[in-house]
């Protein structure tokens, strides 16, 4: 008896095959909007305790899959585990977000450890193995890292800021020191992503949350080029690796991003202009996005219209339905259910 071949709709889209009903998931789908997540988080203690408890991290990764039947699970972790594995002190203050010891001068950058200690991230890899063993074969497992520029913004400032100006200023005033941070993060990210593939990830996503704040010349230098190096480095070892880029806010710079980096897909935020995306981006790679997360708070007819607009704009090509950024903690579960039902009913 021959075994039935299982296809993953998510992988099909990344491989060039449009799906009549687009596969879907949500950025930050394992999060505080879910009561089961809040209960598990309370059991774990701190946010980092949850990230580094393989059993509990696997549990919260699986929770939105059980509840909504998404086509992809993304491992529960954080982009700042890479600085942690580089020996930087990383902590999360309640209500204030991440805190690190800042690398805000060339002398301090000189203290940066250049080699990542992957053993510190073993709980992430173990969580991937657990999730992979429990996921249905047709469900895709996503691993991820932060893009070097975005991670560097937190490392330089020691926290998030409204426009991440400390890192941008260092890049202008001390480009050699800033390049040193980027180089370390590129090599560390390659190693980290390869270990995630080894642990069971099917797809990788590179989150450049702050890339879109850069002007074109700096976007090319600090966003496109480091991402290209990561993609190249991963594929040198794993030639078939499927990789999604998310240079949030890149807008008109997206065509250059996809042409230069070699990603299989790009996530787009809700401000992306649909005609440009269809003509200059989706004609080359798959597109993921791009519902405004605020619509999941609004609900009702506004949410329905937003879902319909995304489907109308992108379903004729290769498309993965997602949000334009992460779901917020105050989004009602019922509104997520409303969105899922509407997307699943679509046959384009």
UniProtKB/Swiss-Prot annotation:
It is found in: Cytoplasm. One of its GO terms (molecular function) is uroporphyrinogen decarboxylase activity. One of its GO terms (biological process) is protoporphyrinogen IX biosynthetic process from glutamate. Coiled coil: none annotated. Homodimer. Belongs to the uroporphyrinogen decarboxylase family. This is Uroporphyrinogen decarboxylase. The gene is hemE.
